[in-house]
């Protein structure tokens, strides 16, 4: 768990630094072009995703032939996606009504091919919880991305982001062979993959549905409000989702293999879900309190060109806290082999998002897209509770002591961050406010845990033990 946290938090912090520095240098239009390209790549990757990596992690006894076959399928899939994107880029750019996006899409089309060339042994490392070696692969890639993008931003503009993205992906791929120590071979024995494909078909459908909502939202913004508005939305979304992405990835990387190994043991599965949910809420509620308080400060630090970013970040912050439950629930569903249930949950969220996106964007502009996310997450949380109520007892996960502890830490973090910002405005003050707010939150959590003898130590010890040993 410790190394998974180092990997994810480190990568997300580097990414945040890269994002903020580039936002100071580049215009929102540049981020709008990147958003279109990233969405385009994501569409074709999702419609061709067969869930091979997840299936390998979930499978109790995957063979060498299955690993090589999965790598071959991934490489062929990425090659098809790359060629298709290069050919379809002008049409996609026209659809978004931004002709300048064409060469950006074509350049980033090579990202899936670079990623797919990585060693499939990474799936085994994930399954066996070797997070230290995974961190040694991802952190250098993030740093290379940062250095290349920031160094070239002044001279190349939006192309600096493209260069950084491709450089980081290449670094990750090369590093995968050093840490995974598995050199895959081309294998066309696809009969070995049928068990994986049967599991992964729901991953494919779920990915398509999830991306449909994101794509539709960005398409509406681009065509009705322009590339600059899409850039503002893209930046706000990335900033607001960073804490949730990092925390969910840290816990999710442990949760998925744990739930897979606890399959058929409902009592232990229930206990694991409660502990993980409690830990996530304890971390994310204070963090998002800081995000909510500091959102206007971030907007001021970035400059007038990023006006209207603050309300979007605040709405998404609330949405992310609600979405924590759904994120963990999906890991439970996948680990238990219920990828069909994960699809239905995603269908509820995306279906709600699609229904409300157009009227909310028409009424509130870019902030309406954030509101659509909030409504979608609420709908998914309600649907998830309905599915879970007969499977897991949740009352311990929302234990009053832990909830009160998180709320107090949130308040302390918010006040500390706001106070530092008032005394020291600017980008440096923003980072100082974040650090002081986090320190205040940690101090309050530890103090209350000691005074009221909360189960915080038990939660942390349990997560560490599971990360290091896996379930018995």
Locations of regions flagged by a protein language model:
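Transmembrane helical elements of multi-pass membrane transporters/channels
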Residues: 3-16, 141, 161-168, 172, ...
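Helix-loop junctions and terminal segments of transmembrane helices
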Residues: 47-64, 126-127, 236, 240-284, ...
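Membrane-proximal transmembrane or re-entrant/amphipathic helices at the cytosolic face
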Residues: 415-472
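Interfacial segments at transmembrane-helix termini and the short loops linking adjacent helices
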Residues: 89-108, 274, 290-321, 327
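Membrane-interface junctions at transmembrane-helix termini in multi-pass inner-membrane proteins
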Residues: 1, 55-64, 114-138, 159, ...
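Interfacial/gating helices of multi-pass transporter permease domains
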Residues: 17-45, 102-103, 195-199, 203, ...
């Amino acid at each position: 768990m410790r190394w998974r946290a180092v990997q994810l938090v480190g990568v997300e912090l580097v990414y945040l630094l890269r994002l903020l520095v580039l936002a100071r240098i580049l215009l929102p239009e540049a981020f709008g072009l990147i958003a279109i390209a990233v969405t385009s790549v994501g569409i074709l990757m999702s419609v061709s995703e067969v869930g091979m990596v997840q299936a390998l992690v979930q499978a109790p006894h995957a063979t060498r032939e299955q690993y090589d076959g999965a790598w071959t399928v991934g490489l062929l899939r990425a090659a098809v996606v790359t060629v298709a994107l290069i050919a379809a880029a002008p049409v996609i750019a026209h659809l978004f009504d931004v002709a300048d996006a064409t060469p950006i899409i074509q350049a980033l089309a090579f990202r899936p091919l670079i990623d797919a060339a990585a060693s499939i042994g990474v799936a085994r490392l994930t399954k066996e919880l070797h997070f230290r070696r995974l961190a040694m692969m991802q952190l250098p890639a993030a740093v290379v991305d940062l250095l290349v993008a920031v160094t070239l931003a002044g001279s190349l503009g939006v192309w600096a982001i493209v260069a950084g993205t491709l450089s980081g992906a290449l670094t990750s791929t090369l590093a995968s062979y050093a840490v995974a120590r598995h050199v895959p071979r081309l294998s066309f024995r696809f009969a070995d993959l049928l068990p994986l494909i049967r599991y992964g078909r729901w991953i494919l459908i779920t990915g398509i549905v999830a991306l449909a909502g994101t794509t539709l939202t960005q398409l509406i913004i681009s065509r009705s409000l322009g590339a600059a508005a899409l850039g503002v939305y893209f930046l706000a979304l990335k900033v607001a989702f960073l804490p949730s992405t990092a925390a969910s990835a840290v816990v999710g990387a442990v949760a998925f293999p744990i739930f897979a190994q606890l399959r058929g043991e409902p009592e232990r599965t229930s206990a694991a879900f409660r502990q993980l949910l409690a830990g996530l809420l304890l971390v994310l509620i204070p963090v998002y309190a800081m995000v909510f308080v500091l959102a206007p400060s971030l907007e001021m630090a970035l400059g007038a060109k990023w006006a209207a970013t603050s309300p979007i970040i605040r709405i998404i912050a609330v949405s992310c806290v609600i979405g924590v439950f759904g994120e963990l629930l999906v890991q439970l569903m996948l680990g238990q082999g219920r990828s069909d249930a994960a699809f239905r949950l995603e269908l509820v969220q995306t279906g709600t998002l699609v229904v409300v996106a157009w009227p909310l964007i028409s009424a509130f502009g870019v902030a309406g897209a954030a509101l659509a996310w909030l409504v979608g997450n609420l709908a998914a949380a309600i649907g998830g509770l309905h599915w879970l109520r007969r499977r897991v007892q949740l009352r311990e996960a929302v234990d009053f002591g832990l909830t009160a502890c998180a709320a107090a830490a949130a308040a302390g973090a918010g006040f500390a961050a706001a106070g530092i910002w008032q005394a020291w405005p600017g980008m440096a003050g923003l980072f100082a406010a974040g650090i002081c707010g986090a320190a205040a939150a940690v101090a309050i959590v530890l103090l209350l845990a000691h005074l009221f003898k909360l189960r915080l130590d038990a939660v942390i010890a349990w997560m560490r033990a599971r990360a290091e040993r896996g379930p018995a």
